[in-house]
Amino acid sequence: MPSLLLASSSSYRRELLTRLRLPFTCKSPDIDESHRLDETAHDLVRRLALEKARALAGEYPHHLIIGSDQVAVLNGQILGKPHTFERALEQLTAASGTSVTFLTGLALLNSSTGEHQVDCVPFTVHMRELDQASIERYLHAEQPYDCAGSFKAEGLGVSLFRSTEGSDATSLIGLPLIRLVDMLIKEGVSVP
């Protein structure tokens, strides 16, 4: 079996991948993550997931390389990582009482053959009605400024949800394990 490489610096994705109990290493790819004109959110995450994997193929020529990328979409608009309290407050205020769809692009590249599998896994979060005081308490408690949509579903962010909808809850955290297992099996990897 080729070695596994996770093309990411995300501690969330690293933690998720450990659940499969397969040995892997991590390396952060250096790519331009800019959104192209006329590119849908679906196409964006698929492209970036594959570009992340391809960026490391030369350095890791005999690996199965996992790339992933995620965006949150609210009312047709892509929500990026907020980076600041003020931007996170804006995002959560806009999301209050509505639904946010997370699109997670996933790519598995066999760097020996160049063959790849790519998919996009959606997951929708239906948000509670949130007042400004609740949003501010949450932001001060968790500081989710590095997370698309301004919350951490794996932490206190779940308290902001009314319900969720999707086929793979791990996609919400950034690495859809159910779909990844399908891809790994197609590459001959035994899981479990």
UniProtKB/Swiss-Prot annotation:
InterPro entries: ITPase-like_fam, Maf-like
Localization terms from the record: Cytoplasm
Hydrolase found in the keyword field: yes
GO cellular component, one term: cytoplasm
Pfam families with a match to the protein in the record: Maf
UniProt site positions, description: Important for substrate specificity: Y12, Q70, E154
Membership in a protein family: Belongs to the Maf family. YceF subfamily.
Role, per record: Nucleoside triphosphate pyrophosphatase that hydrolyzes 7-methyl-GTP (m(7)GTP). May have a dual role in cell division arrest and in preventing the incorporation of modified nucleotides into cellular nucleic acids.
Listed name of the protein: 7-methyl-GTP pyrophosphatase
Organism: Pseudomonas savastanoi pv. phaseolicola (strain 1448A / Race 6)
